């Protein structure tokens, strides 16, 4: 009986792995991130540029994974919709990131429940696969230890 319970538990845990796995390809994400570099940069806490140029239009994406929306300390350009989403508990994960980058204003309106909410990010990523790939890339290079 003990063996059966352990075997079933192992099978259940193994079956859940695909749900926990990220959907994107980090290498493809590095290439797709080129679209983001016009406005964003990834600079670590020591000042080392990981990706991007000197873009300051959007926030530094280092540490974005799990960060509360609208709270990058040295970025002052957040719109009210983004600040409201953060105040309502939005923390960046793959699901929300993918939705946001495909249509920022639509996402903020839905997340905040405010029909007047607007995203300052006007760029819309056309391919959902690119969004997943960029998220996978950010998980590799932009996570604080």
From Swiss-Prot:
Compartment list: Periplasm
A GO MF term: metal ion binding
Changes after translation: Binds 1 heme c group covalently per subunit.
PROSITE patterns reported in the protein's UniProt record: CYTC
UniProt modified residues of type Pyrrolidone carboxylic acid: 22
Gene Ontology terms: cellular component: periplasmic space
Binding site for heme c: 36, 39-40, 121
A biological process term (GO) from this entry: photosynthesis
Primary location recorded for the protein, binned into one broad class: periplasm
Keyword Acetylation applies: no
Alphabetically ordered keywords of this record: Electron transport, Heme, Iron, Metal-binding, Periplasm, Photosynthesis, Pyrrolidone carboxylic acid, Signal, Transport
Signal peptide limits: 1-21
Matches recorded under InterPro entries: Cyt_c-like_dom, Cyt_c-like_dom_sf, Cyt_c_1A/1B
Keyword Metal-binding: yes
PANTHER family: CYTOCHROME C
Biological role stated in the UniProt entry: Cytochrome c2 is found mainly in purple, non-sulfur, photosynthetic bacteria where it functions as the electron donor to the oxidized bacteriochlorophyll in the photophosphorylation pathway. However, it may also have a role in the respiratory chain and is found in some non-photosynthetic bacteria.
Family that this chain belongs to: Belongs to the cytochrome c family.
Protein name: Cytochrome c2
Native source organism of the sequence: Cereibacter sphaeroides (strain ATCC 17023 / DSM 158 / JCM 6121 / CCUG 31486 / LMG 2827 / NBRC 12203 / NCIMB 8253 / ATH 2.4.1.) (Rhodobacter sphaeroides)
Gene: cycA
